């Protein structure tokens, strides 16, 4: 956890029990689920809330992967990254923070997630670090993936 930077954003690499990653699709761009922590909210609860609001999924086994220092030219802050296990995925629903807006969702292999991310050079190290954490806490078992899991699965309403 950063000690000298405010945490302004929290994102999660959300794994299904079969080892895929859930990506949120906004305007054709695949991203991690997450958002801004509320001042009163524990950081892990921010990710749980955002996962429910943006992707209608319930998560647990939330563990810190690390953080990225961001300098947007006006402020310097941290984006915290977690790995978590998806326990349940419901139908797509509008994000309560953006009335009328429903995100697309897709389940992909970690290798595919790296290719789809708009995060440039940090994409692969981020996913590899998340996998390492998920293995440590026993919720990543990709070595047992059936062939059909290697294909993308777009989640419909």
Language-model regions, residue ranges each:
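Acidic, metal-coordinating catalytic segment for phosphate/diphosphate chemistry
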Residues: 1-11
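Entry beta-strands of beta-propeller and related beta-repeat scaffolds
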Residues: 20-21
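Short, surface-exposed beta-strand-loop junctions and turns on beta-sheet-rich folds
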Residues: 29-31, 38-39
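Unchanged
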Residues: 37-60, 65-125
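Charged phosphate-binding loop/patch that engages nucleotide di/tri-phosphates or the phosphate backbone
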Residues: 115-157
């Amino acid at each position: 956890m950063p000690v000298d930077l405010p945490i302004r954003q929290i994102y999660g690499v959300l794994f299904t029990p079969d080892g895929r990653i859930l990506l949120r699709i906004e305007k054709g761009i695949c991203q991690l689920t997450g958002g801004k922590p509320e001042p009163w909210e524990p950081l892990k609860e921010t990710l749980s809330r955002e996962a429910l609001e943006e992707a209608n999924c319930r998560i647990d086994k939330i563990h810190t992967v690390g953080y990225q220092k961001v300098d947007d030219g006006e402020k310097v802050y941290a984006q915290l990254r977690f790995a978590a296990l998806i326990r349940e995925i419901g139908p797509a629903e509008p994000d309560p923070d953006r009335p009328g807006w429903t995100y697309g969702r897709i389940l992909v292999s970690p290798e595919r997630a790296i290719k789809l991310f708009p995060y440039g050079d940090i994409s692969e190290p981020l996913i590899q670090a998340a996998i390492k954490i998920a293995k440590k806490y026993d919720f990543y078992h990709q070595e047992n993936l059936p062939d059909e899991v290697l294909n993308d699965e777009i989640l419909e309403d």
